[in-house]
Amino acid sequence: MRGWFARFRSRFREPRAGLVVTASTELAPGHYVLPDPSDGALRIVGDDLVLDGQGVLLDGGGRGGVGIVLVGCRRVVLRNLTVRGYAWALVAIDCEELLVEDCDFSHNGRSDGTFLDITRVDEGAGGGVKLVRSTASRIVRLQATGQDIGVDLVSCRGIVVADCDLSHNAAWGIRLHGSTDCRLERNRAHHVNRCGGAGCDAAGILLTWGSHRNRVAGNDLRWSGDGFFLGNQFSPPSNDNLVVGNDGSYSPNNAFEATFSRGNVFRRNRACWSNYGFWLGFSTDTVLEENLIADNRIDGVHWEHGARGILRANLIARNGRDGVAFTLDPTNRDFPDRCVSTGHELCGNRFVANSRAAVFLLHTTATRLVGNRYETERTPVLLAGDTRENDIQDVFRTT
């Protein structure tokens, strides 16, 4: 018996506050209340190791701090860990090739009732995983709910976040702040909201501050402040992202928003039952193709002060005002170099029963409509203001 107990003790390590992990370790099962002494309740120091916490709950007791901290580590695996009651469950800085899998990092730092500042790198009270200046890492099958942020990627590159449940948070399911070439795939980030459901810039997924060339695919973003939010008004633009096969419906604001940006592509998404399906203010060279944009309270697509947009093969139906609205406010001189609404192309779209008009052009020029189909539309195309030099080739046979 003494020999068996000795072998058990040698295999498992009992967590304690301030524990430094330097080699592969299995933590002894149990519920451990471990306050953060200042630099993490547990710290990982070293490369090429595995921390396995099957049956372990690390509990910060709601006193803030960080559950697990890694700085400058490479090829570390964290699996089967449950961490709650801290500001952040896991913070990794300047790390490479991390793998976080099958962990529960829920019920950490949370705030509510205040409008979020999407440009602040330290916005939010905390959450599940925060990676800073880290690369080539994977976060898979993570549960991180009931807090401000599920996964926060700051100045990262090549991160994969897949098959995670990041729902019912109060700020963002996933935030990318200055992070590029990442893949966000098949995650659940629904019901991410605050301010009593008004949103206050909460979103299922947020991209900001120069987050380029990311792939956002197959995520459930319903019932969030915005489903998908790419916002950059007073920060570097976030360009050339591919957003495909996501559902951002039932937002109190916008199912999908992409502003002050260039070259983003939205393909085969669902944008329904929100205030707006797509809000694309001050963006250029944006592509919408094969999306379902229906039953929104105001416009299916609202695009102010934009240029060179392409809308191709979308179904745009039963929106409360216009199917697509291209607009310009000549009195808005906040961004004088963007005081245009011009050069858009709509081709092969199907418009059905939008309340005021299928397409509304206000102070819009050099825009082309060709091969679109109009069904039970009261007004296929409505022109207003200084709208001129447009190429409208559609034959308006409404059925």
Cite the ranges covered by each PLM segment.
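Terminal non-domain segments
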Residues: 1-9, 140, 145, 162
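Acidic, glycine- and Ser/Thr-rich low-complexity intrinsically disordered tracts
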Residues: 2-6, 10-12, 339, 347-353, ...
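Proline-centered turn/helix-capping motifs that create local helix->coil transitions or kinks
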Residues: 108-113, 192-193, 225
